[in-house]
Swiss-Prot record:
A GO cellular component annotation in the UniProt record: cytosol
Coarse class of the protein's main subcellular location: cytoplasm
Record-given protein name: Regulator of G-protein signaling 10
Modified residues (Phosphoserine): 24, 41, 176
Organism: Mus musculus (Mouse)
Amino acid sequence: MFTRAVSRLSRKRPPSDIHDGDGSSSSGHQSLKSTAKWASSLENLLEDPEGVQRFREFLKKEFSEENVLFWLACEDFKKTEDRKQMQEKAKEIYMTFLSNKASSQVNVEGQSRLTEKILEEPHPLMFQKLQDQIFNLMKYDSYSRFLKSDLFLKPKRTEEEEEEPPDAQTAAKRASRIYNT
């Protein structure tokens, strides 16, 4: 359940959704604005879907992607109003990130205090202390390294830049015809 929300929160916005304040599309200009905003605080980075995506890519390379995924799952959990959904999400967060058998266990103090019994009576802030620990871990450890990484320093190439030159496309087509015959 929260995995869909995490995916939704961290999905990169398509270039057509990126606009300057006047509504005109300007992905290169917006990218510079975004990276400046991301550099100002981890909070700003986590509010921007493209920022979250790049930060996730960075954390994946550092083998600590579970930290941002846990943080996002907790944010989604806090917004849940339906009690049954809250119970399901609480159990999923616990089983995915906090239990001894968790597939993506985060390193936080106090996780053992959360038990299955507590999960039956969830409340929106039940993971807050653990989420704060992970936020601080990211803020004072991973975030500073991210700001020095290529994922932050080098702007994403636009689709036009990523297209192959015409000669390479023609050569690739010729090669595919040779191997397909």
